[in-house]
Amino acid sequence: MKGSYKSRWVIVIVVVIAAIAAFWFWQGRNDSQSAAPGATKQAQQSPAGGRRGMRSGPLAPVQAATAVEQAVPRYLTGLGTITAANTVTVRSRVDGQLMALHFQEGQQVKAGDLLAEIDPSQFKVALAQAQGQLAKDKATLTNARRDLARYQQLAKTNLVSRQELDAQQALVSETEGTIKADEASVASAQLQLDWSRITAPVDGRVGLKQVDVGNQISSGDTTGIVVITQTHPIDLLFTLPESDIATVVQAQKAGKPLVVEAWDRTNSKKLSEGTLLSLDNQIDATTGTIKVKARFNNQDDALFPNQFVNARMLVDTEQNAVVIPTAALQMGNEGHFVWVLNSENKVSKHLVTPGIQDSQKVVIRAGISAGDRVVTDGIDRLTEGAKVEVVEAQSATTPEEKATSREYAKKGARS
């Protein structure tokens, strides 16, 4: 009894499910039949509409630029540090008390300008003593020469011996030697007095004072009084790979000074322009680089000692080069390529050979010609032969606007 009861319930459930399925089937069929006349009419009005609808849609928006022919400079770049043309630590040559400083920290000075004074009292005394001794010995010499003249007259009549005459002659010579020594002592004392006035040995900018007025200083002090850095002119020391040495040497042989530009740390602003001064005489075996020195007039004080800069040295200019924006150059499995637009705004891939390149533009040595249009933005979804819409680049866009534009380009390409 229990088995037949369960069988009946199973049959009932199956029948209910079948009835529901049949209802939904007939309902869907009626809906499709009612919609068919409209669809047929639309198909009659546009026989190829379905096929075109599968292929049509918004064209992918791209930005393009025209390849131009121009002269392109070739630069060698390196990282460098500004160094003073000369750095001098001003020290005292004599010992004594510092009486005065005659400079302002940071000011520009000329060679010979008075910087400091040491108490000259002791040097004046020493000079006076030397001058007094010189005067005394000169008087002695005068008297000795008079005696010699008398001895010479008396010797003619044999009133004095030859020995006495020779002794007087020796005394005169000895006194003459003493005079020379006295003159040297006077010169030395005068020099010591002169050194009590400390002057600038070179043109340049003085730094911070190293000692205050009133202190006792000596010629052995290593810190000195002040440091002068010569910044007019000023030098730039940077490095280049050893592979660039031949290029630099060849450019030097052309006979023209090589222009070197100093750019700021971010490489966005040119600070100054100078010329190549020299190459080092050996390569650093550890880094495989060579040191290069350039000199700048720096009259505007744009460069400062120990400042970090980016160096760019012009070594050549390539004439009649085909140039495109760097953004147009792409890299694929087959090598470098660009997307070229024809007169119908259809794109095709062209393999190219790039040359000189920077962040803004690149020289194309082979693959395209001047006048060809290349895609610079919206490249992501391009396919061979696809037709695109060329839009103008906005003069100023925010990062959010650029992101929106790229997203729109992707959506258009997908369509």
Curated annotation (Swiss-Prot):
Domain of life: Bacteria
GO function terms (MF aspect): efflux transmembrane transporter activity
Basic and acidic residues bias spans: 399-415
GO cellular component terms given for this protein: efflux pump complex; plasma membrane
Signal peptide, first to last residue: 1-21
UniProt-listed Pfam families: HlyD_D23
Record membrane topology: Peripheral membrane protein
Subcellular locations according to the entry: Cell inner membrane
Annotated keywords: Cell inner membrane, Cell membrane, Membrane, Signal, Transport
Polar residues bias (residue ranges): 31-47
Annotated region described as Disordered, given as residue ranges: 31-60, 392-415
Main location (coarse class): membrane
UniProt induction comment: The mdtABC operon is transcriptionally activated by BaeR.
NCBIfam families hit by this protein: PRK11556.1 (NF008589), RND_mfp (TIGR01730)
HAMAP family for this protein: MdtA
Assembly information from the UniProt record: Part of a tripartite efflux system composed of MdtA, MdtB and MdtC.
Functional summary from the UniProt entry: The MdtABC tripartite complex confers resistance against novobiocin and deoxycholate.
Family, as annotated: Belongs to the membrane fusion protein (MFP) (TC 8.A.1) family.
Name of the protein in question: Multidrug resistance protein MdtA
The organism of origin for this protein: Escherichia coli O157:H7
